[in-house]
């Protein structure tokens, strides 16, 4: 099986396949941004504290899949509440998140 994306935990650099398009690209990017958030906020130790070692990998992937599956909906709700201000706030908050 071939990976469509990966994130370097040391640099936070996301590598995406050139073949990704549309909704799948969005989902994969959100998933990888989840990894960036985990690395940036040093959350891996928190995940490791909460699950048995044999589930560490699966737990990290679950968190990133949650972000990929529900991130757009969450941002959509933010937009419905904040209106146009959401588009100013969300990129700023994302930048802080992965910086």
Regions found by a protein language model. Give the residues of each.
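Walker B catalytic acidic pair
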Residues: 32
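Compositionally biased, non-globular sequence tracts
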Residues: 25, 55, 92, 97-99
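Intrinsically disordered, low-complexity segments enriched in glycine/proline and serine/threonine
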Residues: 35, 63, 96-99
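Active-site scaffold of zinc-dependent metalloenzymes
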Residues: 1-25, 36-45, 56-60, 69
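Post-HExxH zinc-binding segment in Zn-dependent metallohydrolases
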Residues: 48-92
């Amino acid at each position: 099986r071939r990976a469509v994306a990966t994130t370097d935990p040391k640099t936070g650099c996301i590598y995406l396949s050139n073949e990704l398009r549309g909704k799948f690209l969005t989902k994969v990017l959100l998933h990888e941004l989840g990894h960036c958030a985990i690395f940036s906020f040093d959350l891996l130790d928190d995940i490791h504290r909460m699950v048995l070692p044999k589930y560490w990998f699966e737990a990290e992937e679950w968190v990133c899949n949650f972000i990929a599956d529900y991130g757009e909906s969450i941002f959509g709700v933010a937009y419905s509440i904040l209106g146009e201000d959401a588009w100013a706030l969300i990129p700023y908050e994302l930048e802080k998140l992965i910086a």
